[in-house]
């Protein structure tokens, strides 16, 4: 779970991310699809899975980073706050929950690349804990 100090670090860092969240989402999803080809199966209905393609950018922007941004405000109750999303991924989309951790790793890599001077060891640890908690909350309906 996230300690109060971790929550403070995440919120402060996320204020810096804010305006670039859409770009970061598209890039993180592009990285995941390129580096972990088995994840392509979930997006096979898209016309183009190339890094930076319109479909990838749109999903990264509207879906992924919106959910992560919303989660920053729900840190005190991620399971409750992400319940509908967890249910969607578990019962309708049938996404293997191990992919949440793969995506969270790619989000961390992308954040580090975009904010090299702000992505300190403290931020890295807090963001990793936060994204791990998001992954656990998204996996809740699989149990």
From Swiss-Prot:
Residues at which heme b binds: 89
InterPro entries membership: Globin, Globin-like_sf, Globin/Proto, Hemoglobin_a-typ, Hemoglobin_oxygen_transport
Sites of N-acetylserine modification: 1
CDD domains named in the record: Hb-alpha-like
GO cellular component terms given for this protein: blood microparticle; haptoglobin-hemoglobin complex; hemoglobin complex
Binding site for O2: 59
Domain Globin: 1-143
UniProt keywords, alphabetically: Acetylation, Heme, Iron, Metal-binding, Oxygen transport, Transport
Molecular function as annotated in GO: haptoglobin binding; heme binding; metal ion binding; organic acid binding; oxygen binding; oxygen carrier activity; peroxidase activity
Domain of life: Eukaryota
The keyword rRNA-binding is assigned to this record: no
GO biological process, one term: hydrogen peroxide catabolic process
UniProt tissue specificity: Red blood cells.
Pfam families: Globin (PF00042)
Stated role: Involved in oxygen transport from gills to the various peripheral tissues.
Summary of subunit composition and partner proteins: Heterotetramer of two alpha chains and two beta chains.
Recorded family membership: Belongs to the globin family.
Additional free-text comment from the UniProt record: This fish has two hemoglobins: cathodic and anodic. Cathodic Hb has high oxygen affinity, low cooperativity and displays a small reverse Bohr effect. Anodic Hb has low oxygen affinity and cooperativity and displays a normal Bohr effect.
PANTHER family in UniProt: EMBRYONIC ALPHA GLOBIN E1-RELATED (PTHR11442:SF91), HEMOGLOBIN FAMILY MEMBER (PTHR11442)
Protein name as it appears in the record: Hemoglobin cathodic subunit alpha
Organism of origin: Gymnothorax unicolor (Brown moray)
């Amino acid at each position: 779970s996230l300690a109060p100090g971790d929550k403070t670090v995440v919120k402060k860092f996320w204020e810096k991310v804010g305006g670039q969240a859409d770009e970061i989402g598209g890039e993180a999803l592009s990285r995941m699809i390129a580096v972990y080809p088995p994840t392509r199966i979930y997006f096979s209905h898209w016309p183009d899975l190339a890094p930076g393609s319109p479909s990838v950018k749109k999903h990264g922007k509207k879906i992924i980073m919106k959910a992560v941004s919303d989660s920053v405000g729900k840190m005190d109750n991620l399971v409750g706050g992400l319940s509908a999303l967890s249910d969607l991924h578990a019962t309708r989309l049938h996404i293997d929950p191990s992919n949440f951790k793969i995506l969270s790793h790619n989000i961390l890599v992308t954040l580090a690349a975009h904010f090299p001077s702000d992505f300190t060891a403290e931020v890295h640890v807090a963001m990793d804990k936060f994204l791990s908690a998001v992954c656990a909350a998204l996996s809740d309906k699989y149990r």
